[in-house]
Amino acid sequence: MRCLLLTLGLALLCGVQAVEVTPIMTELDTQKVAGTWHTVAMAVSDVSLLDAKSSPLKAYVEGLKPTPEGDLEILLQKRENDKCAQEVLLAKKTDIPAVFKINALDENQLFLLDTDYDSHLLLCMENSASPEHSLVCQSLARTLEVDDQIREKFEDALKTLSVPMRILPAQLEEQCRV
């Protein structure tokens, strides 16, 4: 009986851990993701994270630039005090090619779900340190013209995450070019 309970408990524990696994890219060429990108859609685990117009997470990716150390500089644009502002976020490389550590925007990890390097890139920022465990994802495109295939890839990728996500289209009028 003890053995059965131990086996059942172990099986449940393994099942819980399997739910937390996020499907990320196994390889990433940071040189190929360099350049201009446009945020075409956002998704959040908690819509209140993006409620306020000046929410710190309402930042739009404008470009990516790899550093010689293998880190990734992320050029963001956002509104502060009704004006356009730029911010550069440094994402530090980890042992996993598509996962980076960040210390900004109340988040602590950035990971890439998918990219073809030429037309789309799907990334998420996660705060696993807080009790709420928040997640914000963005669908990026090289051009402002987005086809249905990119939207579908984003929706499909979000379904694989461990928390339910709500998709919000990126509002072009909220974005600014600085």
From Swiss-Prot:
InterPro entries: Blactoglobulin, Calycin, Lipocalin, Lipocalin_CS, Lipocln_cytosolic_FA-bd_dom
Biological role stated in the UniProt entry: Lactoglobulin is the primary component of whey, it binds retinol and is probably involved in the transport of that molecule.
Protein name per the record: Beta-lactoglobulin-1A/1C
GO MF annotation: an example: retinol binding
UniProt similarity note: Belongs to the calycin superfamily. Lipocalin family.
Disulfide topology: C84-C176, C124-C137
Keywords on record: Disulfide bond, Milk protein, Retinol-binding, Secreted, Signal, Transport
Alphabetized Pfam families for the sequence: Lipocalin
